[in-house]
From Swiss-Prot:
Biased composition (Basic residues): 548-560
Family listed: Belongs to the ku70 family.
Known EC number: 3.6.4.12
MF annotations from Gene Ontology: ATP binding; ATP hydrolysis activity; damaged DNA binding; DNA helicase activity; double-stranded DNA binding; telomeric DNA binding
Organism per entry: Cryptococcus neoformans var. neoformans serotype D (strain B-3501A)
Function: Single-stranded DNA-dependent ATP-dependent helicase. Involved in non-homologous end joining (NHEJ) DNA double strand break repair. DNA-binding is sequence-independent but has a high affinity to nicks in double-stranded DNA and to the ends of duplex DNA. Binds to naturally occurring chromosomal ends, and therefore provides chromosomal end protection. Required also for telomere recombination to repair telomeric ends in the absence of telomerase. KU70, of the KU70/KU80 heterodimer, binds to the stem loop of TLC1, the RNA component of telomerase. Involved in telomere maintenance.
Organismal lineage: Eukaryota, Fungi, Dikarya, Basidiomycota, Agaricomycotina
Protein name listed in UniProt: ATP-dependent DNA helicase II subunit 1
Group of enzyme by EC: hydrolase
Amino acid sequence: MSSYYNKGDAPSWEALDQDGLDDVIDTSEPSAVAEDPGNYQPGNYVFQTLRTINAEEMKRLVKLMQTAKEQYEAQDDDETVETTEPEILRKTFPPIEESHEMNIANVIQTCNFLFRDGGTQLRGNKRVFWITDNDMPPGMNNRQPARTSYGDLTTYGVTAETFFIDRPDHRFNPNIFWNDILDREAIDYNDDQPDPEGLSSLADLMKDLVIKTSPKRTHFHVPLKLGKDGEIVIGVSGCSMVSEQGKGASRYVKMRGQVVEEVQSKTEYTSAKSLNSGQWGSNPIKVLGFQAASQLRFQDNLKHPFFIYPNEEEYTGSTRTFAALLNSCLKYNRHALALCRLRSNHVPEFCVLIPQEEKTSSNGQEYPPGFHLIILPYKDSIRPPPKKVAEFLQSPPIATDEQINAMKAVIKRTRFKAAAYRPEIYPNPSLAYHYDQLQALAFEEDWDPEDPAKQALDKTMPLYGGMHSRAGEFMEEFNKEIENDERAVEKLAAPTKRGKAEKETTVNEWDLRNIPDMWKKGTLSQLSILARLRLRRRPFTGQNQKGGYHRRRIRTSFHK
């Protein structure tokens, strides 16, 4: 029996808020499939249609696989009995007779029907996981129906992920049938020792690519005004390019009773006068003018950017006008300066609209056409860097050639394997713990924070062992170069004891410059004569020739 596992709406276990899953088992007894007008191809057992995953269905699958595992392990205990298929799998998915086996195209057509029935509810990427150990499936002599069905599947935007399993006495050869059907190039096949693990590649994929992503949503629909006094108005929509993903909104639930129920909240509205107070009016994007690219500063990009594109729902012809504006900005290398209010009752903000040209490749569109909307900061929001940092940046110390070469060796051996940073494989540790706890609660499992598997949820922890094994000796060489540098040696002066007279002369110059204010506040007694003399740059020692002139003059100035 060959099994084909179909997982829709998520690539490589990339879980969405509404992840869809369905299971298709081929070469099953037709009588095991319920007779239904909407039924799929005969001989294919649809264990679960493509719909949102819930805890009850996952529990049913887990229980089925646990029972099958127990039955299979029970056969291993008796060496005199040959291991066979677990009874629960044969009962749940009864195999069809070899004389009634159907063409493999029926399985692909069933996948087509599943995605078709899912309709517009399917979001994100769509993939089919093919798991089989049969490199010569039924109907391989007539391949045209399978090619046609797979072509129809790709028109839905569905791709196939194959996991071919080696048998103990046979190595799987995809060149016989599957590479031809899936429109893949033939590989160099060698009849080596079969892989004893079988599903090792699938296990590695499940371990490394368990990713949770948030669905991409449009953040706002606003009008874009051009010309004098906004004579030209078009509709635009914007989506966030970078958005911080947080935990879901908390909800109150009623734990008592047979079923956990959500508590229904009641919302009360205030009077219309209270709601209308502080209204800022409509929320458009009004173009004020155009600037050259040299007017932009990198440090002014403080907030998350938005990407805007035309929206024809409110204003007809928005796409044509939007394209003309985009092409003009690209032609003259200009960006638009605008005043925007993206949400109702928000304070207006200045922004720039940076054009982006469409770029395509052999794989399709890489960069869509549109504008990047970047919020500009107000003057009060800008802070200068610390004085020491500014001085350091003006004249930074220059490393020697030996130090540079030593660090090059360290960087070369500690870089990413893919030579690029992939943020999708580094989930937020806090969210990873949160979702894992929710999963344990849904499946009624214990959650132990000391479990090594739970500690491994934090993918941001550096792999110190691998780093030191690859670049440990080069790190030591770099440290030696730094230690031998004379600039890294600091001479610490011995601390000196401060005398009583020196303590009395310590004063805050800012307080001395605000003596009239201190007199008004009644804190003038905190100052001393010596402190005042220090500010006036008068001598501290020596005999006063004019007899008390300083004391009288200072006292008089205190009361002014």
